[in-house]
Regions:
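Charge-rich, low-complexity linker and terminal segments
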Residues: 1-19, 43-44, 81-167
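A positional/architectural concept
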Residues: 1-70
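Short cysteine-rich clusters marking metal-coordination/redox-active sites
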Residues: 73
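Conformational-control "hinges and anchors"
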Residues: 76
């Protein structure tokens, strides 16, 4: 069963029982933490996710989100749209012990009853999908250094020369 909208919050246990799936767009405007990392306002985020149970009966959420995120290229310092894609799989542990065991296996695990904030989760996943050093994927020209001008370290070289002489 798939709903053509994103809910504000979901209950992983109940959704897993019903095998619920959701797909829709999310407005990035209220996502302040993501917004701080962007050079301009992002376009709509499209996401889909679903719930089911694993072999041991735990609720599992599998989802993805895509968005064009405006970033500053670190090579040419121009703005470009980074096509972000986040994929996640979260397991909902049944106890703290269960959570520890799953985390040791390297799984993305949570142990909290109650509903999940959908916007917060998608925001978190997109932040994780941001590149450490954003660059135009198609390549670009590095920022031109001032030609024929004063070398930025000229002053420093003079200073060093003077110090050597003084000692
Ligand atoms: Zn660039």
């Amino acid at each position: 069963m798939e709903s053509a909208y994103l809910p504000k919050s979901v209950d992983p246990e109940r959704s897993a029982d019903q095998g619920l799936e959701f797909a829709g767009d999310l407005d990035p405007a209220p996502l302040a933490r993501l917004g701080e990392l962007l050079a301009a306002q992002a376009g709509p985020i499209s996401s889909r996710f679903g719930f089911r149970r694993d072999e041991e009966g735990r609720a599992v959420m599998v989802g993805s989100a895509e968005a064009s995120l405006p970033l500053i290229c670190q090579r040419c310092t121009d703005l470009f749209l980074f096509e972000a894609r986040a994929d996640w799989r979260r397991v909902f542990a049944r106890s703290e012990t269960d959570e520890q065991e799953l985390a040791e296996k390297g799984l993305d695990v949570c142990y909290h009853g109650g509903p999940l904030d959908v916007a917060e989760l998608i925001e978190e996943e997109l932040i994780l999908a941001l590149p450490m050093a954003p660059r135009h994927p198609e390549g670009c020209e590095p920022v031109a250094r001032p030609a024929g001008g004063i070398h930025p370290f000229a002053g420093l070289a003079e200073l060093l020369k003077r110090e050597t002489r003084d000692n």
